[in-house]
Amino acid sequence: MDSSSVLWENWQTQVKELLEGIHGHQKKTLAFFVLGMVLAGSAVLQRVAEVLQERGISEAKMTSIERRLARFLANERIVVPQVWKLFLAQVLSYFRGKKLYFVLDLTPFQDELSIVYIGLLVHSRVLPVAWAVMPAKTKWEEGQWQIVGRLLDQITVHLPETSCTLIADRGLAGMPLVELCQARQWHYLLRLCQEHTCRRYFQGKLEKSWKRFGQIVLKPGYRWYGQARVWQEDTLETYVSLVWDKGCEEPWLLISDQGAGRRQVQEYAWRMRVEATFQDSKSRGWNIEASWIEQAAHLDRLLLALFLAIWWTSHLAAACIHHGQRQRFDRVDRRDKSIFRLGRLWLLDILRRAHHRASLRCCLPFQHTKTGWRFALRF
C-alpha cells in the first residue's frame, strides 16, 4: 500500500466534503497545498513541490508542481474570506456553548506587511480562526479597530450562546477594544502599559487622584487585586490585577471584566502560546518568510493553506502525546520539539508503519459526526 497516496485520497475527500460550495479544482489544489506543507514541514513552494513529487502524490515535474502552487496564490477567483467562512461554519459548531478563550495579536511579515490575527486557545495550542493581511508602511484602507471588529464578527456568528474571552497584549489594549468586546457580549482580559492611569478602590472608597501604573508597581514581589477606574480620558470601571513576580523583568498590569486575582494572571499567561505559534510559522518552523511573497492577496492565500496545516499538525501532535509517543521524538528531560514538529514527525512515522487504510483515516484532523464536523485533538 502506498500510504502517502492513500492519505492524499482521504484528505482530498475530507476537504471536498468540508468546503461544499467551493469550486472543485480550487478545493483540490488547496488540499494538495496543505498536504504538501504538512509533509514538507515548510510553506516554501519549492520545498512543498519537492515533497509532493518525491512521495508520488503527483507525477508532474517538480517545477510544474511549483508553478501550480504559485498559480493558486495568484488566483483572484479564490476568495479567502468565503472559503474560511465555510470552514468556520463547519468546525466552530463543535465549540458552541463552551467557555472559550481567544488571543488577538499583530505580527509583522517581512518589512512590507502585517498580519492581524485571532487564535482560539485549545489546551496548549492556538488554532487560527480569523486574520487580515495589511500593509506595514502605508495607510490602511480600514481603521485598526474596524478590522478587529470585522474579525470578531467572523467568529461570533458561529458561536451563539457561547462564553468568549479575548486576550490581548499592551499594543492593542485600550477603550476601543473593550467597547468592541462589550458590543458583542465578549469578556476581555488585557495587559496595560505602565504609562496608563488608574484610581483604585480601597474598602469601597475611590482614590482621589489618578496615578500611572508605573507609580504603583515599583519592584518585584508586588501584588494587588481589586476594582479600579482606568484611563483618565475614557474611563472604565473594571477589575485590575497588578503582579510583578520575582525573577520577571516586567510587571503584568491586567484588566478584566470577570474579576481580579491569580486566575486572571494564569489565563493571561496562555497568550504566550501565540508567540510559539508565530515562531512555528516563521524561521523555526513553516518558514513563511522564505516564501518571498510581497503582495497581500498572495500572502492571504498562503495563510489559508498554512492555517489549515496548523489545525492538522495540532491534531497530530495531540494524538502523539495522548498515545504516550512523545518520548520517541523529543527529549524526556525537556521539551525541544514544538507542536508543529511533533505532529509532523508523528505523521511521517504513521506513514512508514501503516498497513491498512483505516489507520490513515484516523490521521485526518476532522471527524464527520451525526451533528456535523468535529475537530479531534486526539485519535
Map each language-model feature to its residues.
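Low-complexity, highly charged intrinsically disordered N-terminal segments
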Residues: 37-73
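Active-site-proximal, Lys/Arg-enriched surface segment
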Residues: 62, 66-125, 130
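Single, function-defining residue in the core of a domain
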Residues: 1-44, 50-51, 84-85, 98-100, ...
